[in-house]
Amino acid sequence: FKSINDTYGHLYGDYVLEEVSRIISKNVRSIDIVGRYGGEEFSVILVNTNIKDCIPLAEKIVKKIAKKTYLKDGIAVNLTISAGMSGFPVHSDSIRDLIGKADKAMYQTKLKGGNGVSIAE
């Protein structure tokens, strides 16, 4: 994502983040929580949902983000994301640990080439 900001500027980068946020928000339930966590990272809390039931949803969101062309002011960019998931209480009962495990899972996705989803071990 840094390359988008460096190439097209932060205003365009912000536009892309807003569009990604919209895609995520449109694909989760109203009781779920979507938030930006850090520069270009998002956290999604799927309330009362088994982690195995989250996989198809996460894969759907990853595909929708990759399918969209982010077009503004004559600039068109396509992007992919790497997602990592952890579940309460399966992987931990600590928010800090859950975020850390989801982060490690995200890096596993990146090591596999990105544009996908991995679950914490």
Regions found by a protein language model. Give the residues of each.
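Conserved long alpha-helical elements within nucleotide-processing catalytic cores of c-di-GMP signaling
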Residues: 2-26, 35-39, 43-44, 51-59, ...
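Conserved beta-strand positions that form and line the central face of beta-propeller blades
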Residues: 3, 33, 116-119
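Short catalytic/binding micro-motifs of nucleotide second-messenger systems
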Residues: 26-31, 63-75, 106-108
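A short pre-motif secondary-structure segment
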Residues: 33-36, 77
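A general secondary-structure junction signal
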Residues: 38, 81-87, 119-121
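Catalytic strand-loop-helix junctions within cyclic-nucleotide turnover domains
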Residues: 45-54, 73-76, 81-98
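Catalytic-core segments of nucleotide cyclases and related cyclic-nucleotide turnover enzymes
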Residues: 55, 88-120
